[in-house]
Amino acid sequence: MYGGLGAHVLALTQAQARRGHEVAVITQAKPGDAGSHVNSNGVEVIRVANHYPDAQMVHERFANWVHGFALASQTACELMSRKPEIVHGHDWIAAGQLNVAAKQFSVPSVLTVHATEFGRHNGWLTSRLSQTIYANERRAVQSADSVIVCSEHMTHEIRCGYGVEPKNLNVIANAVSPLLSIAQRTTHNSENIVVGFIGRLEWEKGVHHIIDAMELIIDERVKLEIVGTGSQLANLQEKVQRKRLGDRVSFLGHIEDRDRAEIVQSWNLAVIPSSYEPFGIVALELGQVGVPIIASQVGGLRDIISSSEFGYLIGEISGGSIARGIESILSNQTLAIKKADRLRSRVEAEFTWDSVVDLTNSVYEKVSA
C-alpha cells in the first residue's frame, strides 16, 4: 500500500479492529518479496507476490501489473482465516479482485474511490493509459454494490463522469490520527517569514504557482519551504533558478511523518494551491498543527475550510492570488492564528477515525440488508 490511500487503509482497518471487527487486508508485497501472512495490530494482513512487479506508468506494463495483482489476490482469498461477510476495495486497481472475492464468497462489495482519472484531467483523457484507467474505473464503480467517496465534490464527479446512481453513493470524509504530542504554537522569533508547502510535487498540486507568488512578493524576509518529492521536482528547481529565487526557496525533500509536525509548526502559513483535490488530507494535517492555510477553492478543500472562519480560500489559482493571500495573512497575523485555531478545533472534533468507522459500518449494514 502506498501514499495517502495506503495510510487511509492502514488507519481505517486498525480502527475497525479496535472496535472488535475481524479485518483481513490483501495487498501487494514489496517488489522481489515472496509475500507474507501476518497479524498487525489486530488486522490480518496478506501480502501477495506479483508476477508482474513493474508498475511503471506505461500502458502495457501497468496493465500487466494490475492483472498480476488480481491473479495473486484470488489465491490470497483462500488464505483468509474466516469467510468475510463483506468485501471492501479501494480505488479501481483493487476492482478486479473485489469482484472476484464478492462472487467467490457470495457477499456484498463496497468500493471507496479516492480519486479519478476523469477528475484529474478535467475529462480530457487523451492518452491510451488514461483511457484504460478510466474504463477500469467506470467498470469498478458500476459493478460495486455501494460506492464511498470522500467529499461532496466527488459525488458530482462520480455521477457525471461515471454514471453512478446517487442512491449507491455515500460521502465519508477522511480523518487524521491524533498527534502524540505537539507544543503550543508560539510567536516566531526568526526574522524570516516562512511559507510552506507539503505534498507530492505533481502538476495538479500547483507548487509552480507558489514560486510565481514568491517572485511577486518584494519582502526578502519571506521564504518558501517545499516538503515532498515527485515528477515535477527538477522542473520546479529549474524554475526557481530561472527566477533567481534560490536564496528564498528551499526544497526539503521527503520528511518522515514523525518529523512533519515540528517542521510545519515552524511555518507562518501554508499554501495548498491544488487544481484537483478530491479530499485534501493535507488540510487536515496542517489544520491539526494549527498553521494558517491558504487553499484553492476546489474539491474537498471546500468541505474542510468551509468558510472564512477557518482559513483563506482563493478562487483563481495563480501567483498573483497567492501573493495577495500571503500579504493578507501577514498584515493581520493575529486574525490568521484565530482562524487556524478554529480549524484545529474542528479537525479534532469532526475528522476522527471513530467517526469514519461508524459511517463505514452504516454503509456495510445498508448494503447487507
Segments the model singles out, each with a brief description of its role:
Residues 188-214:
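Conserved donor-binding/catalytic core segment of Leloir-type glycosyltransferases
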Residues 153, 175:
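Carbohydrate-associated surface elements
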Residues 307-308, 312-319, 328-333:
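Conserved acidic donor-binding segment of nucleotide-sugar-dependent glycosyltransferases
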Residues 1-45, 369:
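N-terminal subdomain of nucleotide-sugar transferases
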Residues 292-295:
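Short hydrophobic beta-strand element within catalytic cores of glycosyltransferases
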Residues 275:
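Aromatic "clamp/platform" in nucleotide-sugar-dependent glycosyltransferases that forms part
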Residues 108, 118-139, 178:
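Nucleotide-sugar donor phosphate/pyrophosphate-binding loop at the beta->alpha transition
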Residues 237-255:
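Nucleotide-activated donor-binding/catalytic signature segment of Leloir-type glycosyltransferases, i.e.
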